[in-house]
Amino acid sequence: GIPCGESCVWIPCITSAIGCSCKSKVCYRN
């Protein structure tokens, strides 16, 4: 539930490397 400061509209979350995932076009962590 914490925004990772990255969007995932066009590309996947690069921040997935630290546990972020795409939700509603924005990368979140927990």
UniProtKB/Swiss-Prot annotation:
Keywords: Disulfide bond, Knottin, Plant defense. Disulfide bonds join C4-C20, C8-C22, C13-C27. This is a cyclic peptide. There is a cross-link at G1-N30 (Cyclopeptide (Gly-Asn)). InterPro entries: Cyclotide, Cyclotide_bracelet_CS, Cyclotide_sf. One of its GO terms (biological process) is defense response. The keyword Kinase does not apply. The keyword Hydrolase does not apply. Probably participates in a plant defense mechanism. Has strong cytotoxic activity against human lymphoma U-937 GTB and human myeloma RPMI-8226/s cell lines. The presence of a 'disulfide through disulfide knot' structurally defines this protein as a knottin. Belongs to the cyclotide family. Bracelet subfamily. This is Vitri peptide A. It comes from Viola arvensis.
